């Protein structure tokens, strides 16, 4: 139910906003926002934001801003879908205000808490674009910007989270598309110079996810050796202009706290190489059989270890139910939205296997993507246990991820004797990693998607 804002305010901040989501290509864009603290008491306050569309009519929008003080928290809101991750707050349009005509406004409000000062936000974004306060008219003959040239890492530089998006050095939302290794303890021959050359040049992959199992003959058997292998693959990805997702591949036991000490040791070592600007840290692959509270506790103990050495890198946090945001356990994103990890510059993992996870899972991701920064750090074109590729569901998933600008890594860039592998068995004994003769049905499908031109905005 809509609520009216109080007429008297204790503080007001007016900021112009541009780049509302939803207008057609080459539409005039622009809007303004008025932030009002309507009441304040010890440790709490109520605020409102009035958005007025100054440009062409829009359908669909997400407002973002940063709480200036670390002690400020969103408690609950209305007239929008609200969420907070660290200090970043987002509000997405709902059914009755999702469409804004020229000159139309939406009145939003929320209750917050604070422990120190309670300053008003000074900057707002819409879909990751910094607000400027003016209307931008389309050119009579709009120019066609050529795709940015250079490798993904060279173009985008140091990544960060802005609102619910992964953003590049130009503060623009981007989508990374790439492949995950299988367990590096089993498929080392698949990750040499020849295969990674083809991944970067022929597959045009933006990223390599390095899956380092902790158990199952993995890290716990040789911490120093596996750390060295991971660092080597990060360097090889960097040499080819790809981002590297360092995956602490926990699976069994499902509670990541079982490996807390190992995680601290491992991430302290790999984060010490903080000159690497192509690294994203994934701290727990697929928590399962464990509560979100326990996963959150683990994350809040591991992230400070990374931040002590590498303060700027993005960190991906696994979610319960095999990183399904709890959907596989009958929950949804609300448990994360209402109890987020107390850290900034983080994203939340969502994993799916297309033949098992279909419309109901896609229906869960759509609203979650307006409330949380999501990264599909692992997905398969098959079921979680079977071989056959579900092409229809896989395409539906990839179309959705493209639409929502959610980054992804496909399981797996390997010649494992399983349906989700990109290559036929024995491929990694040779030098061909691209032709139809070595690709499986899954490999051919995924390669056809990630080898298309990237959309990396630079202005």
Swiss-Prot record:
Residues 28-134 form the CBM2 domain. Residues 148-357 are annotated as: Catalytic. Its EC number is 3.2.1.4. The linker region (also termed 'hinge') may be a potential site for proteolysis. The gene is celA. Belongs to the glycosyl hydrolase 5 (cellulase A) family. GO terms for biological process: cellulose catabolic process. Residues 129-151 are annotated as: Disordered. It comes from Streptomyces lividans. InterPro entries: CBD2, CBM2/CBM3_carb-bd_dom_sf, CBM2_carb-bd_dom_sf, CBM2_CS, Glyco_hydro_5, Glyco_hydro_5_CS, Glycoside_hydrolase_SF. The keyword ATP-binding does not apply. PANTHER family: ENDO-BETA-1,4-GLUCANASE A (PTHR34142), GLYCOSIDE HYDROLASE FAMILY 5 DOMAIN-CONTAINING PROTEIN (PTHR34142:SF1). Residues 136-147 are annotated as: Linker ('hinge') (Pro-Thr box). It catalyses: Endohydrolysis of (1->4)-beta-D-glucosidic linkages in cellulose, lichenin and cereal beta-D-glucans. Disulfide bonds join 31-131. It is an enzyme of class 3 (hydrolase). Keywords: Carbohydrate metabolism, Cellulose degradation, Disulfide bond, Glycosidase, Hydrolase, Polysaccharide degradation, Signal. Gene3D superfamilies: 2.60.40.290, Glycosidases. Residues 1-27 form the signal peptide. This is Endoglucanase CelA. The lineage of its organism: Bacteria, Bacillati, Actinomycetota, Actinomycetes, Kitasatosporales. GO terms for molecular function: cellulase activity; polysaccharide binding. The active site is at residues 286, 378.
């Amino acid at each position: 139910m809509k609520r009216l804002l109080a007429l008297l305010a204790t503080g007001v901040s007016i900021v112009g906003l541009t780049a509302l989501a939803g207008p057609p290509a080459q539409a005039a864009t622009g809007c303004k926002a008025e932030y009002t603290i309507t009441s304040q008491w010890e440790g709490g306050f109520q605020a409102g934001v009035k958005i007025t569309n100054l440009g062409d009519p829009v359908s669909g929008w997400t407002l973002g801003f940063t709480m200036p003080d670390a002690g400020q928290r969103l408690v609950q809101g209305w007239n929008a879908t609200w969420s907070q991750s660290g200090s970043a707050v987002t509000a997405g349009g709902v059914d009755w205000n999702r469409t804004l005509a020229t000159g139309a406004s939406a009145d939003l409000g929320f209750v917050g808490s604070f422990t120190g000062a309670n300053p008003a936000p000074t900057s707002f974004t819409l879909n990751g674009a910094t607000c400027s306060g003016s209307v931008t008219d389309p050119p009579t003959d709009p120019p066609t910007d050529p795709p940015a040239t250079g490798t993904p890492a060279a173009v985008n530089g140091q990544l960060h989270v802005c609102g619910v998006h992964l953003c590049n050095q130009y503060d623009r939302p981007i989508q990374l598309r790439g492949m995950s290794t299988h367990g590096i303890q089993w498929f080392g021959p698949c990750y040499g110079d020849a295969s990674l050359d083809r991944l970067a040049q022929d597959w045009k992959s933006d990223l390599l996810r390095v899956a380092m199992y902790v158990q199952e003959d993995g890290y716990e058997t040789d911490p120093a050796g596996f750390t060295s292998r991971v660092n080597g693959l990060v360097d090889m990805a960097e040499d080819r202009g790809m981002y590297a997702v360092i995956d602490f591949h926990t699976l069994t036991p499902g509670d990541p706290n079982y490996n807390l000490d190992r995680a601290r040791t491992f991430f302290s070592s790999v984060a010490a190489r903080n000159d690497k600007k192509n690294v994203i840290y994934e701290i727990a692959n697929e928590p399962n059989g464990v509560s979100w509270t326990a996963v959150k506790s683990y994350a809040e103990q591991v992230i400070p270890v990374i931040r002590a050495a590498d303060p700027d890198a993005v960190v991906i946090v696994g979610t319960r139910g095999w990183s399904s945001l709890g959907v596989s356990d009958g929950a949804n994103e609300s448990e994360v939205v209402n109890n987020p990890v107390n850290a900034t510059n983080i994203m939340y993992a969502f994993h799916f296997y297309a033949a098992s996870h279909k419309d109901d899972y896609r229906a869960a991701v759509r609203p979650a993507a307006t409330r949380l920064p999501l990264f599909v750090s692992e997905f398969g074109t098959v079921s979680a246990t079977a071989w056959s590729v579900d092409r229809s569901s896989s395409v539906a998933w990839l179309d959705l991820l493209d639409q929502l600008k959610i980054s992804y890594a496909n399981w797996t860039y390997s010649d494992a004797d399983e349906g989700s592998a990109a290559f036929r068995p024995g491929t990694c004994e040779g030098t061909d990693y691209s032709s139809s003769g070595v690709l499986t049905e899954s490999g051919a499908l995924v390669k056809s998607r990630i080898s298309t031109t990237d959309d990396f905005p630079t202005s």
